[in-house]
């Protein structure tokens, strides 16, 4: 009776608490997990499972377990009140999507548990600080997402600091507590996902078609080929300020004392237009969001006059801003002061059809003044002594209504800008007097501002090569199949982004895109498992993404050439390419020596090539042509490779590199031979009796050069030390002989280790070789060849005699007489010790002084060291 009353009186919450305590009890919980783990090992897997499944004794319990599990999972999936969304179970545990569904459910549960634990710890910490129980946390400054919670409105008041949008719905955002470890700065979110998209909230229509943007508010040129900006009717001189020295800077009122109005209605916009018509200058700035829109979305427009500040809600008044403000911004008599207006100008054109005339860009002015920094934050501190809070610069400006901190930040962007404009003009005027510039610095600022205004907005278009511009692709080193996946996913995300009016970075970030292409997941399960974070559009279209991957992999052949091109221009391969030691158009008497591979490089490699060429084109490199070929008519058309080759260095006879390690050890031998064979073409102009170039025939062809005056360090030679070089003088009778250890030159190949001997001619011989005054007859030519062959035969015979001069058969009889049998260990050991040069005596001496120490092969531990002595 009492137990029953206790059960009845016990609340559901307390019962759940007791159940959880019982579950996580140390002994029972761990033992349950242990038994479960042990029993799972008994279940057969893979082939064994299918074998046992043929027997009813195994099949029946398995079917029961399957049915129970499937029913339980279906119940979990149908609980929309728990998940807040539909998570229906696929219907069959054997379905390929069942595993993915289970992974998603587990991820959702774990995430909710983590959020709940963090919230619980935060509340407990606050309770300890204040000493009393806390039900919910009041809002502080900043913003923070709170999982699954919304502030409930009480009447027309929103509790805490949650925001109510124009439609009366509560935005799921609350002010976050300040971070004590970051000097009290609030945590400002870059993206608040719970904000309803302004495109849907305010019915903003955008044209994301893959077509060029049309500037419908501009006049066309006479040939109708381009749009004409209103500024083209004016000159820069029309906007330059006159009598700057007589101007007195107007200091602004404090921010708190300046009248301020948040413009959200058309009547307020009309009042703003009337105010702007009565002033000569005003400051403008825009706040923008690029993350949740394909082309971008202007969120706010800040305008300040000398006496008032305005913030225009560009969401609610989007269709009215252009008609009311277009003529004001176009008026050349009204000065518009902006800071860093490069992007603001095109945003005004895109969203409102507004084209600015008569602009003064303080960002360009700071560059002309050569200030320490060019940011607005620096200008505020430098000219006004105001420390701007720039942490809201990248905040999510779609939030409505604006919190007080963000409103203040938006006002500061334009409130002080006209005063900065006054001070900068004076600085520019002083700069002109001090430096005596040919062009006025003030005029230079207006020229730059003029150029900023005349740029026109262009929509991002998808082309067949758009995927090549993905950040990080060139360094990824993808093959053709991976590159095909990149192209397919780029096209898919572009289509989704245009249709949903989302940025491509939100639909599929570049980093995730490259990771998918690298892994090439061909199933839904593989794709889900590799994603480290949630991406809404991938989860909604996971089947489409996998289909794109599969289809792209089937058409990889079309991307072979693109993959090779990307590998050629990758940073690693660029530095591995051969270095051109001579400038591209270096005349070596035989024509220009230019590397075709350099001319074929794309524009993306220009800076890298210039860096390499700058390091290679030294004075020594330039002297190479003049030193070797400057005074000789015997010319060689050599295409110098960009990276020095040892074979080519040996060909040029640079003996300095004999002391250096070979630079081409990593290059295959056949590649080196092919490079030398294709790049060297020697032409001999004449043959003389005193210099019979006998080996210039088809069998042997030694290379003839003038004696080098300067040897370039950029052309390393790798001639073997055994190769001989013989200088031929004027009266030498042995001019036809070529001395070398090898005695011959390879008939078809020239390499670093098998180079023929190089004949170095002195200056007198060069003149004889170069003399071509008298033509040579065929008989003389035949005589020269015969003499060459005779000298070659003499050389070969002499070499053969020297090679086999001392060869005699081994005398075994004499060897037997030298052998004395019966001498034991002492004699042999003494001979070995004497031959080795060891300072050891006989066995008696060794026993007297003890055994010498030996280097141990193992650490001295235990009996390991003793084994060396025994």
From Swiss-Prot:
Biased composition regions of type Basic and acidic residues, renumbered to the chain: 720-729, 821-834
Gene knockout outcome: No visible phenotype under normal growth conditions. The double mutants rrp6l1 and rrp6l2 have a late flowering phenotype.
Annotated segments matching region Disordered: 583-605, 649-668, 688-775, 821-870
Membrane-spanning ranges: none
SUPFAM superfamilies documented for this protein: HRDC-like, Ribonuclease H-like
Record Pfam families: DNA_pol_A_exo1, HRDC
MF annotations from Gene Ontology: 3'-5'-RNA exonuclease activity; nucleic acid binding; nucleotide binding
Primary location recorded for the protein, binned into one broad class: nucleus
Gene Ontology cellular component list: cytoplasm; nucleolus; nucleus
One GO-annotated biological process of the protein: rRNA processing
Domain HRDC: 479-559
Residue intervals of the 3'-5' exonuclease domain: 263-428
Keyword terms: Cytoplasm, Exonuclease, Hydrolase, Nuclease, Nucleus, RNA-mediated gene silencing
Compartments reported by the entry: Nucleus; Nucleus, Nucleolus; Cytoplasm
Comp. bias (Polar residues): 840-849
Protein task: Acts as an important epigenetic regulator through multiple silencing mechanisms. Involved in association with RRP6L1 in the silencing of the solo LTR locus. Controls levels of non-coding RNAs (ncRNAs) from the solo LTR locus. Seems to function independently of the RNA-mediated gene silencing (RdDM) pathway. Functions redundantly with RRP6L1 in the regulation of FLC locus. Participates in the maintenance of trimethylated 'Lys-27' (H3K27me3) at FLC locus via the regulation of antisense long non-coding RNAs (lncRNAs) and the regulation of diverse antisense RNAs derived from the FLC locus.
Name by which UniProt lists this protein: Protein RRP6-like 2
Species this protein is from: Arabidopsis thaliana (Mouse-ear cress)
Taxonomic lineage: Eukaryota, Viridiplantae, Streptophyta, Embryophyta, Tracheophyta
